[in-house]
Each structure stands twice: as structure tokens, then as C-alpha cells.
């Protein structure tokens, strides 16, 4: 009897184990076929490994994989210019993303002081879908997120610090140094180490081969137009007063007009520097080129907005209110003697005003 029970128990166990094994195999096979069981893609997988500005996406991080941003710019910082590149971009009207939005008659642009002041930031206001000739933001929430994500700007202090940093030396200082190194490298016929990063070599070779006129490009427009965009954003978010924003834009206009001879020249300098900064090749570069070609058409083409704004138009003289705010928000960084010798007029004037404020504070 005991033997019969053991035999029946063994048989029942064998049947149960067989059924269990079958169920496990079925569940495993179903899990592999069921798309709902797949791991949800990361945001990077959803966007693709590299974002390209076919129309400038809301999250265009271009070459960045980790979240590294151009904080208050530190001159010569390697990671800032290799993995911390940021172009401030935003979504726009999907029907025609390059259709300028103008408040009031277009004929008023030629005499509008506000349009004159806002003009340098129009390269980005065009992308945001904002009115080009009027203060204000069409997507304050999106701008706030972008500033935090791409610039580490979260308040008045971090905003003013970054604007001052771009006015002080920005990326142009780095690119001027890189150009000199590239040309020295070519002149000495130095052999490049095989392990030298491809992206670095691409930058150097573009200078050496004078691609797109890099050997004579003035990179100032890249810094000033981005600073204008941050200024407009700061005013729209309440981190700068209207008076501070207008005065900072007056300084930016002064810098552009004492550096270039026309809107077209300034626009081309911005686009070439942006191309250098993106450091792309192949299809990605072609997509970016198409984007900037359309941007250029909207600004300086036959019906471009900048053509309606006189290059030699009147705008207020800068009072350097940004520097007045430095006491509570950031530290002034005067030029060295060597920097002064090579600096353009508008940068020397900015430096003079910085020294005045430093002296006043020391005398308190």
C-alpha cells in the first residue's frame, strides 16, 4: 500500500512539474513577443543619438550626451568646447517655422528703437515664434526649462553672470586661440598623433584649410547674439528689469556695429561660427546648413527683417547697468594687459567701465 502511494505521488509530481514547465515556457515566449514587455526607450533613444536642427528642436543638444552646460564661461576650459556645446533653441509654429512674426506694420521697423535693440536676438526669436520687434516670450515655461537644462540658469544671478561672461570673452576667445594654434601647427608641419581625437582634429583642419573663411572670420557675433537672446529671455521671465535689458541690448548693438559693417556680415559670421561650434560632418552638417540657410533668408534675404532695420540706426548709448548689478550677482573680471592690446574698442570700453566700478567699491 505504501509503495502504491509513493508511486501515485511520484506520478502526480511528475505531471505537476511538466505542466509548470510548459507554463513557464509559454510565458517566456509570450514575453519576448509582447511589445509591451520591452523596456521603455530612454529619452536619448527616442530622440536619436544625435539631435539635428532640421527646424531646431526643443531639445537640440547637438553633440552632447551627458548633461554638461556652458556655465559662466571659463577661458580655455576643454570640456566646455568639446562636450558642453549648447545652442539655445525652441519649438516654433509648425506651419512655417521661419516666418517672422512682426507686431504692427513692417514699415515701422526702420524707425522703431525697440526693434533696433532687439535685432541681435532675432536669430533666436525667429526660432521661438516670438514677435521679433517686441519684448515678451511666447513660451515662458519652455524657455525656463531650456535655461536650466542648457545653461544652468535658474535665477537672476546665474543669468547675469552668464551674459557678462559672453560679453567679457565668450567662445570667441577660445576660437581665436584655436585658430592661432592650428595655423602654427600647419606652419611647423607638425605630425598629428594617431590617437588625437577626431573631433579636435576636424576643428583644427578646418582652420588650416580655411574652410568657409575661418582664417579671417570674426567670431564676435556668435557671443553677442546669444547674449542678446539670454537678455530677452531674462526680461521676459522677470529676472532683469526692462531698463537693464534695453541697456544691455544697447551694449550688444554697440559691439556688433563697431565690429561689422552690415547685418549681412554679422549674420554670416554668426552662421559660420555656429557651424564651427557644431563640429559636424556628413548628413548632420547638411541638415544644419539647410537650417541656417533658411534662417539667413528670413533675416537678410530679399525680404529679410534685418534689411528693414537700418544698420546705422539710432539706439541709446549703453550705461553698463549690467556691471552695476555685479556687486550682488557676479564678480567683474578685468582684462590683462595682453588682452587689452588686442581687444576691440567696445571691449576696451566695457573694461574701462568695469575698472570704474571696482574702484568705486574699493573707495566705499
Residue ranges of predicted features:
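Short, strongly hydrophobic alpha-helical membrane anchors
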Residues: 1-9
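Polar/charged low-complexity regulatory segments
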Residues: 11-18, 22-229, 233-235, 239-242, ...
Amino acid at each position: 500500500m505504501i509503495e502504491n502511494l509513493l508511486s501515485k505521488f511520484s506520478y502526480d509530481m511528475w505531471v505537476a512539474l511538466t505542466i509548470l514547465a510548459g507554463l513557464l515556457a509559454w510565458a517566456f515566449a509570450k514575453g519576448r513577443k509582447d511589445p509591451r514587455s520591452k523596456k521603455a526607450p530612454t529619452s536619448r533613444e527616442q530622440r536619436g543619438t544625435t539631435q539635428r536642427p532640421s527646424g531646431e528642436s526643443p531639445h537640440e543638444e547637438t553633440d552632447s550626451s551627458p548633461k554638461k552646460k556652458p556655465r559662466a564661461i571659463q577661458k580655455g576650459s576643454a570640456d566646455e568646447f568639446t562636450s558642453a556645446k549648447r545652442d539655445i533653441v525652441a519649438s516654433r509654429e509648425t506651419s512655417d517655422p521661419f516666418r517672422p512674426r512682426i507686431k504692427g506694420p513692417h514699415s515701422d521697423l526702420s524707425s522703431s528703437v525697440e526693434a533696433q535693440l532687439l535685432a541681435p536676438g532675432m536669430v533666436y526669436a525667429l526660432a521661438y515664434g516670438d514677435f521679433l520687434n517686441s519684448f515678451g516670450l511666447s513660451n515662458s515655461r519652455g524657455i525656463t526649462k531650456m535655461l536650466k537644462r542648457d545653461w544652468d540658469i535658474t535665477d537672476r544671478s546665474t543669468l547675469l553672470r552668464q551674459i557678462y561672461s559672453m560679453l567679457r570673452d565668450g567662445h570667441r576667445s577660445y576660437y581665436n586661440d584655436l585658430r592661432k594654434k592650428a595655423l602654427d601647427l600647419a606652419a611647423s608641419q607638425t605630425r598629428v598623433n594617431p590617437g588625437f581625437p577626431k573631433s579636435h582634429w576636424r576643428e583644427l583642419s578646418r582652420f588650416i584649410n580655411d574652410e568657409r573663411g575661418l582664417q579671417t572670420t570674426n567670431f564676435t557675433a556668435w557671443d553677442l547674439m546669444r547674449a542678446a537672446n539670454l537678455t530677452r529671455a531674462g526680461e521676459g521671465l522677470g529676472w532683469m528689469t526692462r531698463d537693464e535689458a534695453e541697456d544691455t541690448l544697447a551694449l550688444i548693438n554697440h559691439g556688433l556695429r563697431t565690429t561689422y559693417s552690415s547685418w549681412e556680415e554679422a549674420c554670416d559670421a554668426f552662421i559660420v561660427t555656429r557651424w564651427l561650434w557644431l563640429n559636424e560632418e556628413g548628413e548632420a552638417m547638411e541638415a544644419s546648413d539647410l537650417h541656417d540657410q533658411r534662417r539667413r533668408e528670413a533675416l537678410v534675404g530679399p525680404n529679410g527683417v534685418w534689411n528693414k532695420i537700418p544698420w546705422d540706426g539710432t539706439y541709446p548709448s549703453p550705461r553698463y547697468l549690467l556691471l552695476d548689478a555685479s556687486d550682488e550677482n557676479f564678480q567683474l573680471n578685468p582684462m590683462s594687459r595682453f588682452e587689452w592690446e588686442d581687444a576691440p574698442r567696445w571691449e576696451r570700453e566695457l573694461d574701462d567701465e568695469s575698472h570704474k566700478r571696482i574702484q568705486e567699491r574699493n573707495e566705499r
